Amino acid sequence: MASVVVVGSQWGDEGKGKITDFLSQEADVVSRYQGGDNAGHTIVFNGQTFKLRLIPSGIFFHDKLAVIGNGVVLNPKSLVEELQYLRDKGVNPDNLRISNRAHVILPYHITLDGAQEKAKAGGKIGTTNKGIGPAYMDKAERIGIRVADLLDKDTFAALLKRNLAEKNQIITKLYDLEPLKFEDIFDDYYAYGQTLKPFVTDTSVVINDALDNGQRVLFEGAQGVMLDIDQGTYPYVTSSNPVAGGVTIGSGVGPSKIDNCVGVLKAYTSRVGDGPFPTELFDEVGDFIRETAHEYGTVTKRPRRIGWFDSVVLRHAKRVSGFTHLSLNCLDVLTGLKTIKVCTAYDLNGETIYHYPASLKELEACKPIYEELPGWDEDITGVKTFEELPTNAQNYLRKLEELVGVKIATFSVGPDREQTNVIDHNIWG
């Protein structure tokens, strides 16, 4: 038995899909445990680029299972479209498994998501308007519709009628929008459910059986620790728990079955949407990194905010997720910069602090304390080992390890799988 959790250590978009795809070569099961189609991941496979929102990267290997766990909120329409997208590109998705306990996103969730965000005016949190938050709200309120409910025609009809009666009161009276009609939703979404039915099962049983039989399971998180609803920059967060602890709840697997946790990070920092970002760059260096790395959201297409590497963020992420290894991406993006800054701590009203504050007011007052390191000009995109890196690039990686307190197991010098280089071969234990 062996299991590894892949967790984003910043604000998402760290390249989790790339390292998950890399690690999945040695996995038997690849499982996603939270989030929805609000976060995309980009995977390059056999020379083709795939942009997926819901389906785990294990889908590309027919000798592996790709699992969508119970902690995911599932838009049936999006998933059916994603399955067709894969088929159109020559990928057979028959190795997909979907939890019968996963909650379903319906049109009223999307309508409410947009209306609620619009009503917040200056207090917007940067939602993707995919209905994720309202779906998780229904789950917590115990009125959500699960995949198991979607598959039963009578059950789905009864629950949809009940929920629409309540949601339309909010949609029409609070937000002054047109009500949604039962007949505009029921037939289409029941049909989506029937299309997905062959993939639906109790995924907790699937995963635990695999582990009990000595197979390797890779758990794939969406977003990142700093977007975690409990540990992130609340309220500028997602509605679920991307931290490693989310695996046990979102997959139906006990904590004793989790072996290692890989924190994925960029060689710098990026963020989409509003919220605190102490090391954010507003100059030509930020523009250079954004354009060099094509830093635009996979789903939203929004330009990402760019900043220097922040070790305060990484230490926080390490602490709350228990990283055993780091996987660093985009090292090549920094090539050409004369000087590279690394945030070692914050100055909070004259006091040096090393831990990430919970208070937004304190975060606004925090000023990053930087250490400057010399950059490099050499092309590193063809590098295959740590030793082949320029000395300054080696020193940069060692500095990050020192500041975070976790060793880097892999580093990437480009988007292709072949550009992922391994330092520590014992991620699987």
Swiss-Prot record:
GO BP annotations listed:
'de novo' AMP biosynthetic process; IMP metabolic process
Locate the residues binding Mg(2+).
D13, G40
Q: Which InterPro entries match?
A: Adenylosuccin_syn_GTP-bd, Adenylosuccin_syn_Lys_AS, Adenylosuccinate_synth_dom1, Adenylosuccinate_synth_dom2, Adenylosuccinate_synth_dom3, Adenylosuccinate_synthetase, P-loop_NTPase
Residue positions annotated to bind GTP are 12-18, 40-42, 304, 330-332, 412-414
The active site is formed by D13, H41
Residue sites binding substrate per the record: T298, V299, T300, K301, R302, P303, R304
Which residues of this UniProt protein bind IMP? D13, E14, G15, K16, N38, A39, G40, H41, T128, R142, Q223, T238, R302
**Cofactor dependency:** Mg(2+)
Name the source's superkingdom.
Bacteria
Q: Where in the cell is it found?
A: Cytoplasm
The record, for Pfam families, names:
Adenylsucc_synt
Gene Ontology terms: cellular component: cytoplasm
This enzyme catalyses: IMP + L-aspartate + GTP = N(6)-(1,2-dicarboxyethyl)-AMP + GDP + phosphate + 2 H(+)
- Cofactor details (free text): Binds 1 Mg(2+) ion per subunit.
Q: Which GO terms describe its molecular function?
A: adenylosuccinate synthase activity; GTP binding; magnesium ion binding
**EC id:** 6.3.4.4
Q: In which pathway does it act?
A: Purine metabolism; AMP biosynthesis via de novo pathway; AMP from IMP: step 1/2
Entry keywords, A to Z: Cytoplasm, GTP-binding, Ligase, Magnesium, Metal-binding, Nucleotide-binding, Purine biosynthesis
Q: Does the keyword Cytoplasm apply?
A: yes
Briefly state the protein's biological role.
Answer: Plays an important role in the de novo pathway of purine nucleotide biosynthesis. Catalyzes the first committed step in the biosynthesis of AMP from IMP.
The record describes its quaternary structure and partners as: Homodimer.
UniProt similarity note: Belongs to the adenylosuccinate synthetase family.
What is the protein name stated in its UniProt record?
Adenylosuccinate synthetase
| Organism (species) | Lactiplantibacillus plantarum (strain ATCC BAA-793 / NCIMB 8826 / WCFS1)
The gene from which this protein is expressed is purA
